[in-house]
Amino acid sequence: CTVERLMRANGWHGVTRTKKVRTTVADPQASRAADLVDRQFRVPAPNMLVVADFTYVRLVTGVFVYTAFVIDAFAGRIVGWECSASKHDRFVRSAIRQAAALRTAEGNPLSGNTIHHSDAGSQYTSVRFGETLSLSGLTPSIGSVGDAFDNALAETTIGLYKTEAVRADSPFRRGPLHRLADVELLTAEWVHWYNTSRLMHRLDRTPPIEFEAEHYAREVATQPGAHQ
């Protein structure tokens, strides 16, 4: 596809780092859930573990906007995302609600046993965020503050987003980023491509959504009476 050709032509293999903007700020008054993941992000099925984090995107005005992601650890599929002009917890809660609604619509709703893992940023330790997790069928798990290894899968996905979607020479950009809507558009297009077309090496060069579909097809095929 055009995106893949442009990526190869540009030789994109990593992120060119600029001055880091701090997005993870802990709330010293907030209670924190235990770390139920302990850096073990490989799971045998969807809906067992989702990871979450957010990053910043700089507009041409110098103002930052923020993009939050919810990622299923099984195939790395992005199941929820939201862009916001502020770092208030509303936008990370919205990403969670999107993930829950998507899984319900697909007939595979989140259960109370689904773990939601994030860092210890204040957005993810707020009371309202905890309520959103509970209502969405998720059990909280919290890593440390600002340690990339404690949330490595989310950090990796965000790195791909910054490289493949946000960079000035990205094929998903239609020009300078003037406003929040510009970031929302490029994010929507990148997420769709990432889920449906990006070949993932750890999935034997299969896109995330296809890898999930193959898993569910195997489940159906092994059910009693499936071949009757």
Feature-to-residue mapping (PLM):
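Charged DNA-binding/catalytic regions of mobile-element recombinases
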Residues: 1-228
